[in-house]
């Protein structure tokens, strides 16, 4: 009888030890789990950052996965040329080449013929000819006056490669592709002995109400803002400047009670497009009070300070900022490495080890 009790208590002690070990393992795993929330207005580059995480931390895109983007690449290319053609009328710009008017009619009649994600050689030739028209180029230069994908020139300048037989999208083609994010997309990966759970949330106004579900237990927020959007308006409200919307959104996030103890990193994205644009369009179009030089450094720093000045708790909370180009893998790799070090440092601070 006594031996029965003894073996029972041994069994119970063993179970207790196993449970203790499991709880310890769970606690360690939780301590190493980083919940990253990607926030920002629509078309600020959040989804491109997620794609970069797959390239940098998850062995990239297989040939099969790249092939799945072929239809998106063609759709983005077609939507871009259609947007420019439509804007020709709105902005009152004339074609230069005599054939372009006829090509426009052909394009509009063939616009629904992207069957099985392929582009016919005839459609490709029409798009190529139109893109080569100086009138279209003049209209493209005024892209901030209508809605046009950032990737328009990237694809339209490379139509020969994109429409060659046997074309398979490469990683740059995938990074430049644009599909509106609806809902919440989670990506998991490991880096520097941490397990990351990254959440990409749709940025358009209609999507933002879904963010609330992600707020609990967030380690770090990466807020993306497009530097190049200073002379553009929202897709969903053409009365609102995109940069002003981004600042308004950042203000509500960085000063939100939910995020009082959350690390916040600001990605001032699309620095490549900004560098190109700032030589042509003065920053005062967005910030009338700005009288400084219209250089990448001066205008870029001014925008950065507009965001950082919104932080009402500067003495308690530091906001880290980086200028980024989300389509540049090396740049994102370097910046994300720095972000991870910030997360590690903040975690050690929380544990009293820093």
From Swiss-Prot:
Q: Which UniProt keywords apply?
A: Cytoplasm, GTP-binding, Lipoprotein, Magnesium, Metal-binding, Myristate, Nucleotide-binding, Sensory transduction, Taste, Transducer, Vision
Cite a GO CC annotation.
Answer: cytoplasm
Subcellular location, in the record's words? Answer: Cytoplasm
Residue ranges for the region (G2 motif) are 173-181
Q: Where is this region: G1 motif?
A: 35-48
Which parts of this chain are annotated as the region Disordered?
A: 1-27
Q: Which residues form the G-alpha domain?
A: 32-354
Q: What is the effect of changing residue 352 to P?
A: Loss of activation by both bitter and sweet compounds due to disruption of interaction with taste receptors
Region annotation (G5 motif) maps to 324-329
Region (G4 motif) residue ranges read: 265-272
- Offer one example of a GO biological process linked to this entry: sensory perception of taste
Extent of Basic and acidic residues compositional bias:
8-27
- PROSITE patterns found in the cross-reference section: G_ALPHA
- The residues listed in the UniProt record as binding Mg(2+), with positions renumbered to this chain, are 47, 181
Identify the stretch(es) annotated as G3 motif: 196-205
Give additional notes from the record.
Answer: Transgenic expression of GNAT3 restores responsiveness of GNAT3 deficient mice to both bitter and sweet compounds, whereas expression of mutated Gly-352 transgene do not. Furthermore, in wild-type mice, this mutated transgene acts as a dominant-negative by inhibition of endogenous GNAT3 interactions with taste receptors.
Q: How does it assemble?
A: G proteins are composed of 3 units; alpha, beta and gamma, respectively GNAT3, GNB1 and GNG13 for Gustducin heterotrimer for bitter taste transduction. The alpha chain contains the guanine nucleotide binding site. Component of the TAS2R14-GNAT3 complex, consisting of TAS2R14, GNAT3, GNB1 and GNG2; within the complex interacts with TAS2R14; this complex plays a role in the perception of bitterness. Gustducin heterotrimer may also be composed of GNAT3, GNB3 and GNG13.
Q: What is this protein called?
A: Guanine nucleotide-binding protein G(t) subunit alpha-3
Native species of this protein?
Answer: Rattus norvegicus (Rat)
